[in-house]
């Protein structure tokens, strides 16, 4: 059997691995900045266009609705043409959407902003499918969640930079009621996208193929993963991601309104600044999560964080004054690891379905399209504080997914607190099952052995038991 075309992260030299990791990680900063500005524009447009909180969530509907529509297509595109071309397409759409913010601001058209945001969302959906999937498979599955948390930590850095910029230039002086600053900020964002596109064109980014990934998991005794519709961990991961992202986006969309309405004398400018501090808390939590995920099983840690998110979201909806503000900061901290953990747990060991599965999980970001609208309707009808009951449902769904994975693992192989290298465990099982050689032909699903067929059947059963 000829070796599979392409490579895997574990086959790269240390230098090429570090280069690929750093280059793809730069993409996380790109969409973190755009996302950080989005929630601030939500409040800014309420003032400039004299629209309600519910109407302002059209931005979230366009941005996250683009993920729902475009992410599956992006996964299919990269399955055929590879990660690098997918990154080029994503950066191109991202820059194009940002450029159209200029005429929208110039002619004061809220609909233009909504349309431009949709195009940006399509670009970022493509980048998320590429970057999240690439980082997840760029090495051992044991550290996939830690790697993705580290890379997405830079998304958090950019996320608090957006509100910080807004607090200085969107809400002060004449900028509080105009869009002059918005158009220049987004022209700079478009320029950043163009520069990154040029850098990726001239850089040698190693292509990690699904054939190579399939061969890698075959080497440790994992049989054919079966059709895509049977990848229940991935399908339920999409449900969990849809619910979680919807909750996260709803929480962030009304932070400025929530802080101003708390009755403790917080202005819009000060609220935007505090929002950036919330994002700093989120980012710090993500880097702390990198350390924790080296030692604690990702599904178990996600279960704990999901329960904490549920509790503090309820706290935000009920507590008044600075008590609610404190619960809000805690909520941002415990949100930190959720998205990367759901992604890596849902796409683990998919083999030939890796890119398609990545597209499905990223499609879950579309949950951010309708949660803010539901929350905005409740905020208009009751209060911003009470509207934070809406995200609670999303955190509960995410927690059930994580707890389900923990229970499933406990039933099959016993309860596991520590994070373990499953590939190493399976290789050891294969070696024990085949003492004559313990080796697989590279890229094959049969073993070199002189063991009689009757003994081989028992050995294969041992391997399949470890797979469970």
Regions found by a protein language model. Name each.
Residues 69-111:
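Conserved MFS/SLC helix-loop-helix module at the cytosolic interface between two early adjacent transmembrane helices
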């Amino acid at each position: 059997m000829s070796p599979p075309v392409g490579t895997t992260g574990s086959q790269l030299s240390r230098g090429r691995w570090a280069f690929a990791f750093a280059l793809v990680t730069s993409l996380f900063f790109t969409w973190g900045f755009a996302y950080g500005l989005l929630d601030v524009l939500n409040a800014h447009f309420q003032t400039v266009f004299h629209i309600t909180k519910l109407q302002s969530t059209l931005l979230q509907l366009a941005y996250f609705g683009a993920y729902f529509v475009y992410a599956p297509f992006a996964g299919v595109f990269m399955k055929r043409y590879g990660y690098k071309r997918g990154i080029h397409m994503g950066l191109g759409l991202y820059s194009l959407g940002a450029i159209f913010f200029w005429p929208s601001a110039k002619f004061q058209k809220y609909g233009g902003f909504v349309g431009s945001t949709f195009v940006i969302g399509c670009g970022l959906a493509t980048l998320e499918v590429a970057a999240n999937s690439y980082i997840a498979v760029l090495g051992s599955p044991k550290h996939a969640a830690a790697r993705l948390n580290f890379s997405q930590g830079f998304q958090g850095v950019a996320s608090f930079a957006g509100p910080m910029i807004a607090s200085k230039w969107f809400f002060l002086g004449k900028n509080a009621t105009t869009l002059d600053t918005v158009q220049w900020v987004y022209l700079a964002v478009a320029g950043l996208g163009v520069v990154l596109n040029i850098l990726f064109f001239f850089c040698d980014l190693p292509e990690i193929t699904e054939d190579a990934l399939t061969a890698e998991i075959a080497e440790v005794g994992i049989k054919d993963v079966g059709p895509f519709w049977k990848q229940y961990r991935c399908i339920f991961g999409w449900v969990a991601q849809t619910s979680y992202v919807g909750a996260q986006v709803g929480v962030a969309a009304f932070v400025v309104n929530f802080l101003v309405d708390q009755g403790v004398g917080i202005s819009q400018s000060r609220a935007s600044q505090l929002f950036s501090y919330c994002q700093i808390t989120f980012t710090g939590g993500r880097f702390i999560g990198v350390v924790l995920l080296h030692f604690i099983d990702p599904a178990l840690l996600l279960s704990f964080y999901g329960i904490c998110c549920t509790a503090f979201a309820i706290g935000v909806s009920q507590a008044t004054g600075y008590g609610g503000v404190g619960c809000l900061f805690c909520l941002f901290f415990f949100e930190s690891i959720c998205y990367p953990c759901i992604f890596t747990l849902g796409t683990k060991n998919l083999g030939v379905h890796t890119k398609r599965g990545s597209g499905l999980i990223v499609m879950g970001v579309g949950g951010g399209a309708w949660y803010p609208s539901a929350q905005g309707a409740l905020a208009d009808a009751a209060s911003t504080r009470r509207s934070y009951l809406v995200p609670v449902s999303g955190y509960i769904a995410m927690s059930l997914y994580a707890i389900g994975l923990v229970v499933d693992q406990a039933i099959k192989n016993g309860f596991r607190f520590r994070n373990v290298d499953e590939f190493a465990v399976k290789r050891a099982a294969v070696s024990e099952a085949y003492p004559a050689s313990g080796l697989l032909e590279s890229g094959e699903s049969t073993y070199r052995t002189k063991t009689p067929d009757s003994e081989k059947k028992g050995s294969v059963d041992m391997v399949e038991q470890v797979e469970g």
